Design a protein with these regions (language model features):
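Short, intrinsically disordered, charge-balanced linker/junction segments flanking boundaries
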Residues: 14, 104-105, 116, 270-278
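Conserved helicase motor core of SF1/SF2 NTP-dependent helicases
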Residues: 22-23, 27, 45-50, 174-262, ...
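Conserved P-loop NTPase-based nucleic-acid remodeling module centered on helicase motor cores
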Residues: 28-101
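Hydrophobic "anchor" residues on beta-strands that sit immediately upstream
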Residues: 42, 166-170, 194-195
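Accessory N-terminal region flanking or inserted into the helicase ATPase core
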Residues: 81-169, 178-183, 206
């Protein structure tokens, strides 16, 4: 996909390549970094990075792990945040369901109560503490003039500070959350051409608010890439065993060929047998 679609686009002076998360961005940037000039790489961003830049923000404006932990201490909520000040999924990566519920609600554009009622969380949550925590977070950010990653997208969507582009290319679009889809709509309005790259079968960020249904229903000319250069046959067989159980109305059916080599799949019966730290 990169060779077929992105490299030709680099000849256009006004093209922006965007990714839903920093992990997706790293994957798309790697094969390109040696094939283009450094000045062109400024056109390769995550959605959060684009919002951050267009809003004229500085890193000192961004909520860090210690800020969330400070708020937790004030309210007697034990929390550890693992982002190291970097956006990976657009989601606050913490061990606190309180922070996760609040952020998920904002990303999805729903109320805290609606997110709480999704049955994704434990029964130990004090429902009344959720609003108290949200108010404390808002007050903390206001007092210290800080923003979080969700604020960046929200502020971009309100201000619509979007340059004009000939083409935007959005990678891993199946992982866009409702708030990111709103940002995409603004980008689309300010671009002559839009390419969405993604695969609903690879949607793994539902827990972080990914709106796969929006990706599936987006009006566009569908192009199914017929050949994978990454997946061997044995892995495709396992994947198809799972995917074929999904009702037709829940996914986009597609035909594609795996790599020539068959490969192999190992079955591991215990997590203790996985070399997680090697």
């Amino acid at each position: 996909a990169i060779t077929t679609y992105i490299f030709p686009l680099l000849r256009i002076t006004s093209v922006f390549v965007l990714a839903a998360t920093s992990w997706a961005f790293a994957a798309i940037k790697k094969p390109i970094v040696n094939s283009t000039s450094k000045k062109d790489l400024k056109y390769f961003r995550t959605l959060h990075s684009l919002a951050f830049t267009e809003l004229g923000m500085k890193k000192s404006n961004v909520m860090q792990d210690e800020h969330y932990e400070d708020i937790g201490r004030k309210l007697g909520i034990e929390v550890t945040v693992y982002s190291n000040g970097e956006e990976k999924t657009g989601f606050v990566d913490s061990d606190s369901e309180y922070f996760n519920i609040i952020n998920a609600a904002r990303i999805k554009g729903i109320t805290i109560e609606e997110e709480y009622n999704t049955d994704m969380y434990s029964q130990d949550i004090d429902k009344h503490m959720l609003q108290i925590l949200k108010d404390e977070v808002d007050n903390y950010k206001y007092s210290y003039k800080l923003v979080d990653f969700t604020d960046m997208i929200e502020k971009f969507n309100v201000a619509e500070l979007c340059p004009k582009y000939d083409v935007i290319f959005v990678d891993e679009a199946q992982d866009l959350s409702p708030i990111q889809w709103k940002m995409y709509d603004i980008l689309k309005k300010n671009s002559k051409h839009v390419i969405l790259a993604g695969d609903d079968d690879q949607a793994i960020y539902g827990w972080a608010g990914a709106d796969v249904a929006r990706f599936q229903s987006e009006p566009a000319k569908d192009i199914i890439l017929p050949q994978s250069y990454r997946i061997p046959g044995a892995v495709q067989d396992i994947a198809n065993c799972i995917l074929n159980r999904i009702p037709d109305h829940r996914r986009i059916k597609k035909q594609w060929s795996p790599r020539p080599e068959k490969g192999y799949v190992e079955y591991v019966t215990s997590i203790e047998d996985l070399p997680l730290y090697s």
